[in-house]
């Protein structure tokens, strides 16, 4: 990113605008935004969407661990010096598992379920339980949106197969990956 946009702290916004503007709703082509570590996902994407306007494009946003800058050799040696063998094995296994989740994240999980009309089959959510709250249920479960539709931190929706039509939020596998840069291994 820095090589493509010299002199800028972040050019993710410029790249995202380019990707979003290349989407064509008539032909069904989709764009993809790849980003690396160190960016505030929600703030950057919100800036982009404010400039180009809210769209209904299905934009897959996921973190790619291969974009992270390599650590200097001195930092790596100092880190390994204070770690025990079991720590290295455990962290390596965790990093591999998290990398696998990040690489397959966009393929497995819907980020914008409102773009999937087939999931909105239950028009009378809650009517079988209590008729007095049907209107509330329909409004709440059908229109309650996330803080940011492109957020990867809040959890991804899993749609219930019951006649309630409610959304069950589960933990996001990418958000659960440990940020190894936050570990203070030198002061254990």
Swiss-Prot record:
Q: What is its EC number?
A: 1.11.1.7
Gene Ontology MF, one: lactoperoxidase activity
**Catalyses which reaction(s):** 2 a phenolic donor + H2O2 = 2 a phenolic radical donor + 2 H2O
Q: How is the protein altered post-translationally, as described in the entry?
A: Partially N-glycosylated.
Annotated compartments? Secreted
Q: Which GO terms describe its cellular component?
A: extracellular region
Output the GO biological process annotations, alphabetical, semicolon-separated: hydrogen peroxide catabolic process
Q: Which UniProt keywords apply?
A: Glycoprotein, Hydrogen peroxide, Oxidoreductase, Peroxidase, Secreted
> Which superkingdom, per the lineage?
Eukaryota
Entry's family note: Belongs to the peroxidase family.
Question: Which protein is depicted?
Answer: Peroxidase B
């Amino acid at each position: 990113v820095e090589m493509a946009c010299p002199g800028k702290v972040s050019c993710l916004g410029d790249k995202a605008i380019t990707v979003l503007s290349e989407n064509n709703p008539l032909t069904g082509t989709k764009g993809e935004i790849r980003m690396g570590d160190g960016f505030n996902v929600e703030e950057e994407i919100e800036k982009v969407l404010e400039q180009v306007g809210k769209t209904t494009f299905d934009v897959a946003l996921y973190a790619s661990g291969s974009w992270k800058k390599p650590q200097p050799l001195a930092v790596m040696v100092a880190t390994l010096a204070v770690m025990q063998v079991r720590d290295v094995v455990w962290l390596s296994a965790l990093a591999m598992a998290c990398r696998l989740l990040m690489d397959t994240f966009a393929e497995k999980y819907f980020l914008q379920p409102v773009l999937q009309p087939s999931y909105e089959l239950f028009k009378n959510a809650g009517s079988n339980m209590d008729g007095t709250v049907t209107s509330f249920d329909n409004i709440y479960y059908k229109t309650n949106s996330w803080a940011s539709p492109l957020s990867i931190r809040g959890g991804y929706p899993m749609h219930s197969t019951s006649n309630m039509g409610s959304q069950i939020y589960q933990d996001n596998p990418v958000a659960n990956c440990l940020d190894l840069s936050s570990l203070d291994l030198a002061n254990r």
